[in-house]
Amino acid sequence: SKVNDKERAVKLQEALIKLDRKSKQKYFLAPNIKSINDNPFTDGMIPIVKLDFNTVVLKHHKLYKEIKNDEELKKKFILKTCRSDKNLIYAALYKEIHKLQQLFINEFEDIKSEKIIEFSNWLKSNYDPDWDLANLILKGVGIHNGRLHRSITQYQVLLFDDENSGLNSLISTSSLIEGVNTSAKNVIIWSIKSGQGNNNLTSLSYKNIKGRAGRMFKHFVGNVYELVEPKLKNMDDIQLSIEIDNSLIG
């Protein structure tokens, strides 16, 4: 919407206007939309058709019922799980990322991967020889958050998507759902805060995070491991309000 992202909203509207001039048929796909207000883009279209299905099998594991806020049990599980497969770890807050970072650095052995060693050495040479991220990378674990240079996060995602790179786990904040197209066999919910004033996530954001588990033709079975209870702000269905930029109409 224009409220959340005015620049991108205008660009999208420009694209829709061009599409409308060229095509007599069109349809739109969007998650969690309950209704759409009257607007020129959807005028005359059939009502919303709601679809509720997954292209992969998604298994939910509510481990918080067994863990019961036991920090040591959380650590034990995450160390065991992250030794194999592809894992996305949602840690929410920077202090939680730091905690996990130190855990992996202390407990995991360095992996023997040419790409990983080369990247770690590059980080040490161009940033800081004692940078924790450079040491963490050697353990086969990366970090994705808004504080890192974009090129560094993008390259980590590239390594993560490479089955043979050796980078099998990514620790992330909500930056994971902001324009990053990646997936994993396992999504691990380490903490549930949004990071913005320590508020809980909305149910919509949480669905987006869980949706990273599994991917058609890659991970046919995805796992969501909840190590903490997901206390969410309810936002299950959205009424989409489209504000038209008057400068585009004419």
Identify the role of each PLM range.
Residues 65-69, 74-76, 81-169, 184, ...:
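Conserved C-terminal RecA-like helicase domain
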Residues 35-82:
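Interdomain hinge/linker at the junction between the two RecA-like core domains of SF2 helicases
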Residues 2-3, 35, 178, 215:
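Residues immediately C-terminal
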Residues 22, 42-44, 137, 182-183:
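Short, structured coil segments at secondary-structure junctions
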Residues 99-100, 244-250:
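Long, largely alpha-helical accessory region at the distal end of helicase-like NTP-driven motors
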Residues 20-34, 186, 190-195, 199-243:
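Conserved segment of the helicase C-terminal RecA-like domain
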